[in-house]
């Protein structure tokens, strides 16, 4: 068994497609890994307490819990809509406060944390490994805890427990307050996996510093090891070369994307790019990926129609070899090569109506997690298709044209 953790969103608003990219990327990776029997235990978090949530609750005259539950539910709904397999654990910070307090207590007991005016800070000066994840010039880089700069012993020290009476708070041995963001993730990993080191830590590229750096150093303090064997960072989605973000108001909400382009278009988009490099999108690129997604769905349905009609036995050994090849590409994040392989099979299928190619395509689309692949072609669909072919052969074009439109609506042609 291997262990993977992927940082989740801060649930203060509806997620946009930039928020969905990391979880979609690792969904594809895990589908490949699981197929070749490399089993991962997958932990994903939801940051459901944060200054942004408190601010939103105040503006809308709601509680922090009402805001976080609303947008947590929305995010979980989007996982389903985008056909993303649910992680083994989805943990909310607010469900784990006592555990996080205990974790901070361990760091204080170890001498890695110090207390100032009721807040607890991590002492980065004790660990020369600090900076090893980001490789940044720490003399020029601060972590952004400006509210605490007059309390910290060192500019790079970060808050483990924040003393405050603003928003939702909890009692701790040090003060009334709430945990720091950087300690929430490392505490969850330590608690759920109970391992000194996990195999993969994933998330957006913007989390390298300070978040991943600060997660990592806490694990080094407690266990003497880097938190993860591999740190994998997913590139941003940009709108016409500008980072997509709520603050810039240049984002596409996850549900709006589905309404305009379809859920499988997003999976197609991710498969057409490198996982670690930024994607710059615009209307033309999204429409192009929508066409590719539609082509894949039509191909899937036509391949199923052929399989339903055929009495020939399928070559299951060759199909299995093909799927193992695709799975290994997924596991290695070589997504663009998968599109090349799919298009080769589509070309073969279309040129000679090849049954083996049809079977490979059907199973491949299922492996890749396209939502359309969960919908089977029915006998009624096959009857409609065969009727269209008969009418077309008999040159009853008025009838065949009408049937063609029905088939097209069902994405069978």
UniProtKB/Swiss-Prot annotation:
Binds 1 zinc ion per subunit. ATP binds at residue 246. The keyword Transferase does not apply. GO terms for biological process: cysteinyl-tRNA aminoacylation. It comes from Mycoplasma mobile (strain ATCC 43663 / 163K / NCTC 11711). GO terms for molecular function: ATP binding; cysteine-tRNA ligase activity; zinc ion binding. GO terms for cellular component: cytosol. Its EC number is 6.1.1.16. A motif ('KMSKS' region) lies at residues 243-247. This is Cysteine--tRNA ligase. Monomer. It is an enzyme of class 6 (ligase). InterPro entries: Cys-tRNA-ligase, Cys-tRNA/MSH_ligase, Rossmann-like_a/b/a_fold, tRNA-synt_1_cat_dom. Keywords: Aminoacyl-tRNA synthetase, ATP-binding, Cytoplasm, Ligase, Metal-binding, Nucleotide-binding, Protein biosynthesis, Zinc. Its cofactor is Zn(2+). A motif ('HIGH' region) lies at residues 9-19. Zn(2+) binds at residues 7, 185, 211, 215. It is found in: Cytoplasm. The keyword Nucleus does not apply. It catalyses: tRNA(Cys) + L-cysteine + ATP = L-cysteinyl-tRNA(Cys) + AMP + diphosphate. Belongs to the class-I aminoacyl-tRNA synthetase family.
């Amino acid at each position: 068994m291997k262990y993977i953790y992927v940082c989740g969103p801060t649930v203060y608003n509806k997620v946009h497609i930039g928020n969905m990219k990391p979880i979609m990327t690792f969904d594809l990776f895990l589908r490949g890994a699981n197929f070749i029997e490399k089993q991962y235990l997958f932990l994903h978090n939801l940051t459901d307490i944060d200054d942004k949530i408190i601010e939103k609750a105040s503006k809308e005259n709601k509680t922090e819990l009402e805001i976080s539950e609303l947008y947590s539910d929305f995010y979980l709904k989007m996982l389903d809509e985008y056909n993303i397999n649910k992680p083994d654990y989805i943990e909310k910070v607010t469900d784990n406060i006592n555990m996080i307090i205990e974790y901070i207590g361990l760091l204080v007991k170890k001498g890695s944390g110090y207390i100032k005016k009721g807040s607890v800070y991590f002492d980065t000066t004790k660990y020369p490994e600090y900076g090893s994840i980001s490789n940044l010039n720490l003399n020029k880089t601060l972590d952004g805890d400006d509210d605490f700069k007059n309390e910290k012993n060192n500019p790079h020290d970060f808050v483990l427990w924040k003393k405050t009476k603003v928003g939702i708070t909890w009692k701790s041995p040090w003060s009334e307050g709430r945990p720091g963001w950087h300690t929430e993730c490392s505490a969850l990993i330590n608690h759920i996996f109970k391992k000194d080191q996990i195999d993969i830590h994933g998330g957006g590229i913007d989390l390298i510093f300070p978040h991943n750096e600060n997660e990592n150093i806490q694990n080094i303090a407690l266990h003497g090891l880097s938190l993860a064997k591999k740190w994998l960072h997913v590139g941003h989605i940009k709108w016409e070369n500008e980072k997509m973000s709520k603050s810039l108001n240049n984002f596409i909400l996850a549900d709006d994307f589905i309404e305009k382009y379809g859920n499988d278009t997003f999976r197609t988009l991710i498969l057409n790019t490198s996982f670690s490099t930024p994607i710059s999108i615009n209307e033309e690129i999204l429409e192009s990926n929508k066409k590719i997604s539609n082509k894949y769905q039509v191909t899937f349905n036509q391949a199923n129609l052929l399989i339903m009609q055929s009495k020939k036995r399928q070559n299951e050994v060759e199909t299995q070899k093909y799927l193992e090849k695709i799975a290994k590409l997924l596991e290695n994040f070589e997504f663009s090569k998968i599109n090349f392989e799919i298009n080769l099979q589509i070309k073969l299928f279309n040129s000679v109506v090849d049954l083996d190619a049809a079977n490979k395509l059907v199973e491949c689309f299922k492996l890749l997690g396209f939502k359309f692949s969960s919908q089977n072609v029915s006998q009624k669909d096959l009857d409609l298709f065969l009727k269209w072919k008969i009418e077309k052969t008999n040159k009853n074009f008025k009838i065949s044209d009408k049937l063609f439109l029905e088939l097209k609506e069902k994405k069978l042609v």
